[in-house]
Structures are given as structure tokens and as C-alpha cells.
Amino acid sequence: MKAFDRPALTVLLVQGARDLSLNLSEAQITKLIDYLALMAKWNSVYNLTAVRDPVQMVTQHLLDSLAAVSAFSNAKNVLDVGAGGGLPGIVLAIWAAEAHPEMRISMIDTVHKKTAFLTQVKAELNLSNVSVYTARVEQWQAPQKFDVITSRAFADLSDFVNWSEHLLADGGQYIALKGVAPDTEVAGLPAGWQVREVRALQVPTLQAERHLVFIERTVL
């Protein structure tokens, strides 16, 4: 792994946030870099991400997730399915702690080493708006239903919906983070579900396509 140059990474993050028109506080910037440092440290043993270069991690992890956060502005209870190393859930939690302090983010993954990492991040960064669960989402009975369920690089859209629809509140929506526009996946959605919007995202310094897919129940 390349050296973790905190000042340089901070400059890159601050500029990227500015390009996204996000007004992040100094405390939020510090927590995001702290999170990245934890990921880089744990990644050598736990293989949380294939991205090893901290500069690329700022772009492909932090800015990639930050580009999506405004879509969650009206959410109260969010579930991040297949949370992995914490994307977008941890980034969303750091942003929401100041921007939307009423928001709560639950994160679920089947892999214990990943939820152990998320639990450590929650503790070290004092993220009181985060809950972490180790379970299969299709078998999980949550303490409450969620108005937004999200995922990043988790599964085909049809599987994503089928496995977690019992957890979505009435009137809730899915927000899936995808690369290229998933036209084939959209066409394969199960009956009773519709795509409300596919929104292209521009991620600073990333030369790749990113899209948000908004899915909701079909109104009869």
C-alpha cells in the first residue's frame, strides 16, 4: 500500500467536496479521513476493498459516496444492505450527523469480519447514529422498517428488492448506487416495483459512470 499522506488526502477530499457543492465541516473532514485510515489499516488483514492506494480510496470510496448523499436528505431510517467496508453507510452517517441529525443508519452484512470493522469504526468515530447487524438480510427481522434501503455493489436489482422488501416501510424507496446505467437489471425488476428515476452522478476526479437508481412500489 502507498503511504497514507493525511495532509494530501485531506486537500483532495476538501476539493472534491467543494466540487460536489457540499459544505463539510472541519470535524466531518477529519472523521472521513479517520475512517479512511481505519479502512487502510484493517484492509491489509481483512480485505475490505480491492482499492489499496489511499488517493484512489478518496475518489472511489469517499467522493463516490458523498456524490450520493443529497438523495437521502428526507430520509429518517436508512438501511445499508451488504454494507461491507461501510460504503455508503459510514460516509452517509458522518455527513448526516451534522446535516440531518435525526437520521439513523443501520448497516447489515453477513460477513462477521466486515461488521466487526464497522463496529470498530462506529466506536472510534463516535457515530451514535449508526447500528450494525450481522445477518442475512432476507432472514433478518429488523426492530423497525426503513423509509430508505440502499446498497452499493451488492446485488442485481431484482435480488436486492426480493431479499429486503419485507424491511421497506409503506411509502419507502430503494436508492441503489450503480456504475453504468443498469438497463437490463431495471427491466428484470419483479412485479409490483417500478423505477422512479435513474440519476447520473458526477464524481470529482473519477473517469467512470455512476448512477443512482430510485425504486418504489407500483401504485395500483
UniProtKB/Swiss-Prot annotation:
Q: Which Pfam families match?
A: GidB (PF02527)
Superkingdom is: Bacteria
Q: Which UniProt keywords apply?
A: Cytoplasm, Methyltransferase, rRNA processing, S-adenosyl-L-methionine, Transferase
The catalytic activity, as recorded, is: guanosine(527) in 16S rRNA + S-adenosyl-L-methionine = N(7)-methylguanosine(527) in 16S rRNA + S-adenosyl-L-homocysteine
Group of enzyme by EC: transferase
Heme: is it a keyword of this entry? no
User: Where is the major localization of this protein?
Assistant: cytoplasm
Q: Which InterPro entries match?
A: rRNA_ssu_MeTfrase_G (IPR003682), SAM-dependent_MTases_sf (IPR029063)
Q: Which GO terms describe its cellular component?
A: cytosol
Q: GO MF terms on file?
A: rRNA (guanine-N7-)-methyltransferase activity
EC number, UniProt record = 2.1.1.170
Can you say where in the cell this protein is located? Cytoplasm
S-adenosyl-L-methionine found in the keyword field: yes
Tell me the residue numbers annotated for binding S-adenosyl-L-methionine: 82, 87, 137-138, 152
Family matches, as SUPFAM superfamilies:
S-adenosyl-L-methionine-dependent methyltransferases
| Record family assignment | Belongs to the methyltransferase superfamily. RNA methyltransferase RsmG family.
Q: What does this protein do?
A: Specifically methylates the N7 position of guanine in position 527 of 16S rRNA.
| The protein, known as | Ribosomal RNA small subunit methyltransferase G
Query: Which organism encodes this protein?
Result: Janthinobacterium sp. (strain Marseille)
- Give the lineage: Bacteria, Pseudomonadati, Pseudomonadota, Betaproteobacteria, Burkholderiales
What gene name does this entry carry? Answer: rsmG
